[in-house]
UniProtKB/Swiss-Prot annotation:
Subcellular location: Cytoplasm
GO cellular component, one term: HslUV protease complex
Record carries keyword Cytoplasm: yes
Primary role: ATPase subunit of a proteasome-like degradation complex; this subunit has chaperone activity. The binding of ATP and its subsequent hydrolysis by HslU are essential for unfolding of protein substrates subsequently hydrolyzed by HslV. HslU recognizes the N-terminal part of its protein substrates and unfolds these before they are guided to HslV for hydrolysis.
Name this polypeptide is given: ATP-dependent protease ATPase subunit HslU
Coiled-coil regions listed in the entry: none
Keywords assigned by UniProt, alphabetized: ATP-binding, Chaperone, Cytoplasm, Nucleotide-binding
Lineage, top ranks: Bacteria, Pseudomonadati, Pseudomonadota, Gammaproteobacteria, Pasteurellales
CDD domains for this protein: RecA-like_HslU
Keyword Repeat: no
InterPro entries linked: AAA+_ATPase, ATP-dep_Clp_protease_ClpX, ATPase_AAA_core, Clp_ATPase_C, HslU, P-loop_NTPase
GO molecular function terms noted in the UniProt entry: ATP binding; ATP hydrolysis activity; peptidase activity; proteasome-activating activity
Main subcellular location of this protein, as a coarse class: cytoplasm
């Protein structure tokens, strides 16, 4: 990650409206990962990431920031919900599985990078295998391949193959099929299941079987097989573990749902237990994964929650101390809704325009129409539950319902969505609080 904080914020601005404080915090945290890697080894080990706690109501962009960050970081990234985990000893997923899943993601990422690096060699080998099926080499009576003059023919076929002229032709090929072992275990023991599966699959040799498929599909399968032959599994494991330890990012959503609310007890015991189990992972510990031991000392943790019932101070004091950077995301205004409808690269209005274009219907959203949509969504949020920008999806679906249903019969038409159109479609529902609650 060599992008500067300003570049990261600019990239996030293309998809997320407002919330500049949160964008700055994640941009600085991401850049600090790169800065740390430029330091000498002894100093590098002393610098730990400054974990972030994002606080804000639902639908204001917390999860979207995480989603976009994952694409920008090009590093092992996992998003989990705190409510999915239980204290050790209870039935359910343990928090250690977060790091195991992150290691799996890292392995996949490193393998993809290795495949890309060897793509040219793998491409040539895959093409050779296809050409061997199309133009089987001549053999003598002892089974030895004879050198014949078909080199020029192979070149002609290779050119056709690369140009896609043979894509639809069917051939029969041998593909390796790993042995799949299904193991049934009780709930909460998924980690043991995956380890046993890896053990048994490693003991069973891969078999090959013949399959008929189109050349374009066969080329993809063979490309994967040939690329797998060119990578060193042990080297991949080392790189994957290093990527997790030095660049891994964990986003924990709904952290407020595992707070102990007030003086209540009972069901909250397990919630507090999840917080206690999170402590060593965030502070720095070693987790055993199927790829090897992973140290969590330098993994960046970003936690988020609405904190509408609980408060950040309801988290365990030790956990609060491990989340030193606090960022508050603001509730969205009507003006924010207007910007969300038009400014992002894949704005909602653009999505609907392009979808209807496939049916030959031209949709035009006027400025006063967009203002009315934003106002309607904002009013429904005020009257009922405030679900932030997600309300725009429900309002737009309601607005576009008739056009979406009839689009196939209205090819060639132009539909202008202005203030009057929006009022006619939504006013009854927006004004009636009971209808708003159930429909929008």
């Amino acid at each position: 990650m060599s992008m500067t904080p300003r570049e990261i914020v600019s990239e996030l601005d293309a998809h997320i409206i407002g919330q500049n404080e949160a964008k700055r915090a994640v941009a600085i945290a991401l850049r600090n990962r790169w800065r740390r890697m430029q330091l000498p080894e002894d100093l590098r080990q002393e610098i730990t990431p400054k974990n972030i706690l994002m606080i804000g109501p639902t639908g204001v962009g917390k999860t979207e920031i995480a989603r976009r960050l994952a694409k920008l970081a090009n590093a092992p990234f996992i998003k989990v919900e705190a409510t999915k985990f239980t204290e050790v000893g209870y039935v359910g997923k343990e928090v250690d599985s977060i790091i195991r899943d992150l290691a799996d993601i890292s392995m996949k990422l490193v393998r993809q990078q290795a495949v890309e690096k060897n793509r040219m060699k793998a491409q040539d080998a895959a093409e050779d295998r296809i050409l061997d099926v199309l133009l089987p080499p001549a053999k003598d009576q002892w089974g030895n391949v004879q050198e014949t003059g078909n080199a020029s023919t192979r070149q002609v076929f290779r050119k056709k193959l690369r140009e896609g002229q043979l894509d639809e032709r069917e051939i029969e090929i041998d593909i390796s099929t790993p042995v799949n072992v299904e193991i049934m275990t009780p709930p909460g023991m998924e980690d043991m299941t995956s380890q046993l599966q890896s053990l048994f699959e490693g003991m069973s040799p891969n078999k090959t079987k013949k399959r008929k498929m189109k050349i374009k599909d066969a080329l993809k399968v063979m490309l994967d097989e040939e690329a797998a032959k060119l990578v060193n599994p042990e080297e991949l494991k080392q790189k994957a573990i290093e990527a997790v330890e030095q660049h891994g990012i964990v986003f924990i959503d709904e952290i407020d749902k595992i707070c102990k609310k007030g003086e209540h007890s009972g069901g909250d015991v397990s919630r507090e237990g999840v917080q206690r189990d999170l402590l060593p992972i965030i502070e720095g510990s070693t987790v055993n994964t199927k790829h090897g031991m992973v140290k969590t000392d330098h993994i960046l943790f970003i936690c988020s929650g609405a904190f509408q019932v609980a408060r950040p101070s309801d988290l365990l004091p030790e956990l609060q101390g491990r989340l030193p950077i606090r960022v508050e995301l603001k509730s969205l205004t009507k003006e924010d809704f207007e910007r969300i409808l038009t400014e992002p690269n894949a704005s909602l209005t653009l999505q609907y325009r392009e979808l209807m274009k496939t049916e030959g219907v031209d949709i035009e959203f006027t400025q006063d129409g967009i203002s009315k949509i934003a106002e309607s969504a904002f009013r429904v949020n005020e009257k009922t539950e405030n679900i932030g920008a997600r309300r725009l999806h429900t309002v737009l679906e309601r607005l576009m319902d008739g056009i979406s249903f009839d689009a196939s019969e209205r090819a060639g038409e132009k539909v202008v969505i202005d203030e009057k159109y929006v009022s006619d479609a939504l006013n009854d529902v927006v004004e009636n609080e009971d209808l708003s609650r159930f429909i929008l």
